[in-house]
Each structure stands twice: as structure tokens, then as C-alpha cells.
Amino acid sequence: MSMEFDAVIIGGGVSGCATFYTLSEYSSLKRVAIVEKCSKLAQISSSAKANSQTIHDGSIETNYTPEKAKKVRLSAYKTRQYALNKGLQNEVIFETQKMAIGVGDEECEFMKKRYESFKEIFVGLEEFDKQKIKELEPNVILGANGIDRHENIIGHGYRKDWSTMNFAKLSENFVEEALKLKPNNQVFLNFKVKKIEKRNDTYAVISEDAEEVYAKFVLVNAGSYALPLAQSMGYGLDLGCLPVAGSFYFVPDLLRGKVYTVQNPKLPFAAVHGDPDAVIKGKTRIGPTALTMPKLERNKCWLKGISLELLKMDLNRDVFKIAFDLMSDKEIRNYVFKNMVFELPIIGKRKFLKDAQKIIPTLSLEDLEYAHGFGEVRPQVLDRTKRKLELGEKKICTHKGITFNMTPSPGATSCLQNALVDSQEIAAYLGESFELERFYKDLSPEELEN
């Protein structure tokens, strides 16, 4: 079996698998490979346990500006449309209601203004008053002793929307389709990359077991590990990483759909939301919390999981200055300490209950169950030159046949949009063709028309 490929993708999560499919379906590349360190695809950030299983299209994510929502909506549409085109309903993609709510006069005023801006972007977006929310999500309004909660509440959202996705199963489908299209493609599991070497006009991707695969182009979609790999080759040395891990709590099946809350604009992390679990029936997840930790993967034991690569990246004056500046803000400081408390046994559950009751007021301590093994690290990039936290996705394009992607949320939602960008770059670099018009025709006709 030849180990030489046109392109090798490092990382078998949903982003890497989407590019594997896109190159196979729409480009003239003949052989593409994925190398993945786990024994199965999509076992880390793309696992159904690691994320909220949400297609983040911007309609109920209150931290998105209208400009960002317009872009994210188109990205989300591609991922949704792929699943519907392939007939993956109720296996990979699920239909449910969803809404964002404002609680209290200040948040309600914000939600009213937001609706006026966003109803033009999202066709069919509906505004919900307190009575309508009670009809759709009775447990959001029901207070103590069977009496409605006293706060003013309004929201907006959809009564039905293809809004829930199992990104692990989507990853598997991408790979299955890609292998049908190009049987010479290859997937290498249990291949933990140790280093990447440039050898003339080819890259050698070398595993810890001394296996080697070769490619003219390497795309690194390795989540938290992308930046350490880049820095090992001399790229991205002006960047650091703030790993933020999210945890969830299970509650009984008290919500009919997704319920999101208003996010503090100062905080780069999602506000607490409720999501009926698509995999574990009869359970609803409340979360995430946000805890910084010196690990590139969440669910490893503490000592084994501490990352030497992370320490190399972050043990410098610039990173400490960024951290100091962030912690100097009272709201951010209180948020960080509060989330540290959430992780403590016994007391953490008591403290989290108050946040969870913003969504379901009647929740009791007995209703909350810490979701062990759920949640994952999202690498937030620190720009050491600008001395600030960079929100969202980060790409290092070397223009030398290797690109590094760091894709925290909404990276899974945007997987096909990111795959489009990367596939076009790879095809152009290798002098191959890419059928952009057919891509848009299949997955985003709206962009083709415009």
C-alpha cells in the first residue's frame, strides 16, 4: 500500500472529516488521507459528549452581532443541508423547537431590540411573550407552588427547526461518502503525530510509532494540538493558548427544546443553556460551565493530562500579561472564580443550581446530576503581539503547503464552510480543480444566486 498522498489531514474530528469529503467530492485530487490519534473518528471535541449538539446558526446565540450571524447562518445552512440531502434525519440531524430568552426588564429590553435586527436575517424567526413561552416551554415559566415566576420574560426562536446534530455520526458519514467517491483514499487510526518534516517538495507526517505518510499538502485540523504542531515547525510563535473546558449537568427531561439565555458581552464563553440530549434519551443537559486548565484534553487524569506543549507555549511574560489584564476586570474575575467553584464536589452543585434555575425555576438540588465524562477543552487563542484574547477560529496559512486550523465553537457548525476554504486552498496550491459552483448548488444555492 502506497503511503504517498496528494493531501493528508491531521485530525479525524468533524472539521477534518468535512474537508476529507469536500476534497473527494468536489476536487480533482486523486488520493487524500486522514490520520487520527484515537481508535475511532470524532472521539474528542466532535464526540456527542463533548459539545451541546447544537447547530449554531446565530438565531438564538445572543453574543453574535447581526454581521456575524449573517455569516454563521450561511455556514450552518451548508452543514444542515448536507445532512438533509443525505437523508440523515433522526440519525444525525434532529428537529426540535429552540428559543433564546431574556429574564428581567434589562434582558427583555435587549431581546426586543435584538429581535428587530435579527428577524430580517432569519426568515420565520418568531417573537415569544411570556404566555407563548409558557405554552411552548411550561417549565421555563412555572415557579414555586405552581405559580408563574414573577420576572418579566420574552424570547424569540423557532417552534420547529433542524437545530440538533450528532457531529460524531456526521463525521463518520463524511468519511463513508469520501471513501465511496475515492476508493484510494485512506484513513489511519491510532496514528498519533509526533512531528512533521519537510522533505524537498513533500511533507512527512511521522507518528509516535515511527510510521510515516507523505503528502504534497498537509492540513492540520487537530483541535487543541494544532498550535503546538505549528510552533514545532516555527509557525505561530506569536500565539499562546488558553484552554477552556466546559462541563455539563444532567437534569430530568423538563425541556421540549433548546433554551438559551442572554450572554454577558464581556465574557467570551457561552451563557448557560438547556438542551435535550440527542443521544441519552430522557436527559436534558444544562451548561456549559467554563474552567481554564493546563490541559489540551479534558477527560484525562489530572497528572497525565497536564500538557508540556501548553507550558512551552504559555510560560512567558506576554501570556501572563494577557491573563493579568483579563483577571483585572471584576466581572471576568468573578466569572472565573464562580466556575472554579462549580467543579467542586457538593458545593459546586449547590452554586450551579442558581444559574440553572434561570432556565427552569423549579429545579431542586436532587434534580442536578454532574455529567461525568462530558464536555471538552476549547482552545482560545492568545495573541502575544496584540496582548489580547482572540475570540473564534484561528488559521495559520504558511503558503508553503501546510495550514493549521484552531476551531473552537462554532467550528463544528461551520465545518463545511471551513472545508470549502481549505479545499480551495489545497486545490489551488496543487494545481488541481475545484467545482465551486456545484458545491454551492448542492449545499448553499442562496450563495450561488448572489
From Swiss-Prot:
Pathway named in the protein's UniProt entry: Carbohydrate metabolism; tricarboxylic acid cycle; oxaloacetate from (S)-malate (quinone route): step 1/1
Cellular localisation: Cell membrane
Signal peptide: none
GO biological process: tricarboxylic acid cycle
Enzyme Commission number(s): 1.1.5.4
Cofactor(s) of this protein: FAD
Top-level taxon in the UniProt lineage: Bacteria
UniProt remark on cofactor binding: The FAD is tightly bound.
Role, per record: Catalyzes oxidation of malate to oxaloacetate in the citric acid cycle. Donates electrons to quinones of the electron transfer chain.
Protein's name in the database: Malate:quinone oxidoreductase
